[in-house]
């Protein structure tokens, strides 16, 4: 087994997965943050007589959370370990070589996966850039359409 080549491929796969999944993780964390802030503010309003120290602490923690700059949104260690396990154990290098499979084909397949993930990410970025109305909510679409016609939508 060609260890340096395997490590390069492994690192490439990890980087491609990180770049591909990070935007969706940021959106998911942003939605969770918004939901938790709303939930905590609602709980605070419901129990106006109680002390809100715990709720205020949690509320401040969620308000400080910035999904864009949070480094914990990278690939989790468990995901990395499972990918490493697949590359080390599940491929069974010696068995595949004994069966006549070329190891170069396995590496080519991994490189194709990396290229696919990079191209898919780039495609999604271009669609978002040149078709900005694609990910708008229904309310935002209604406001946009009303603005085109010259109407104001009440908030």
UniProtKB/Swiss-Prot annotation:
One of its GO terms (cellular component) is mitochondrion. One of its GO terms (biological process) is macroautophagy. The keyword Signal does not apply. It is found in: Mitochondrion. The keyword Mitochondrion applies. It comes from the Eukaryota. Keywords: Mitochondrion, Stress response, Transit peptide. Pfam families: Complex1_LYR_2 (PF13233). Present with 589 molecules/cell in log phase SD medium. PANTHER family: ATP SYNTHASE ASSEMBLY FACTOR FMC1, MITOCHONDRIAL. Belongs to the FMC1 family. Needed for the assembly of the mitochondrial F1-F0 complex at high temperature. This is ATP synthase assembly factor FMC1, mitochondrial. It comes from Saccharomyces cerevisiae (strain ATCC 204508 / S288c) (Baker's yeast).
């Amino acid at each position: 087994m060609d260890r340096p080549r395997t490590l390069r491929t492994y690192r490439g796969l990890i980087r491609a997965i990180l770049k591909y999944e990070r935007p969706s993780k940021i959106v998911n964390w942003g939605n969770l943050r918004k939901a938790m802030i709303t939930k905590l503010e609602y709980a605070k309003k419901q129990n106006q007589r109680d002390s809100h120290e715990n709720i205020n602490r949690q509320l401040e923690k969620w308000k400080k959370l910035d999904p864009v700059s949070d480094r914990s949104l990278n690939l989790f260690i468990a995901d990395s370990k499972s990918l490493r396990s697949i590359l080390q154990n599940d491929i069974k290098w010696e068995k595949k070589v004994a069966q006549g499979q070329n190891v170069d084909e396995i590496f080519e397949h991994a490189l194709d996966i990396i290229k696919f993930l990079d191209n898919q990410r780039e495609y999604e970025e271009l669609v978002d850039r040149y078709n900005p109305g694609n990910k708008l909510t229904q309310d935002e679409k209604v406001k946009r359409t009303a603005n085109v016609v010259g109407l104001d939508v009440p908030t």
